């Protein structure tokens, strides 16, 4: 909990983000999901986020508060758990970033003082094509 956790993803064509889905293995507290643009090799500016919600075990899909058109490129799917009890399904590949952040609305820009790591969670965006 109290960590803003990001994983890098690539969008191959223009699309509008509708929702974000995250797999919860162990429930606990609330969760917020978001997407940031890319800045160098790290998350940059917040593009969209969900409202805070109480997740259930398994897949949790939440609409973003404002659907957003995205161009092809690199983005970061980001999640913010309220506490350390909540656990996702973790893999040991991929590019990840994380840092301490108090639960609430996601910051407008991701901190440049992050820890880099190798991981990915079961986490995806649902998109609509133009």
Q: Language-model features: where?
A:
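Generic detector of ordered secondary-structure context
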Residues: 1, 12-13, 25, 69
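Cross-kingdom TIR/SEFIR domain
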Residues: 117-119
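Low-complexity, Pro/Thr/Ser/Gly/Ala-rich linker/spacer regions in secreted
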Residues: 127-130
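A carbohydrate-recognition surface predominantly in extracellular/luminal proteins
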Residues: 7, 20-22
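Extended extracellular/luminal ectodomain segments enriched in beta-structured repeat modules
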Residues: 11-19, 28
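Aromatic- and Gly/Pro-enriched, solvent-exposed loop/edge beta-strand patches characteristic
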Residues: 24-115
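Short beta-strands within extracellular/lumenal beta-sheet-rich domains
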Residues: 1-11, 59-62
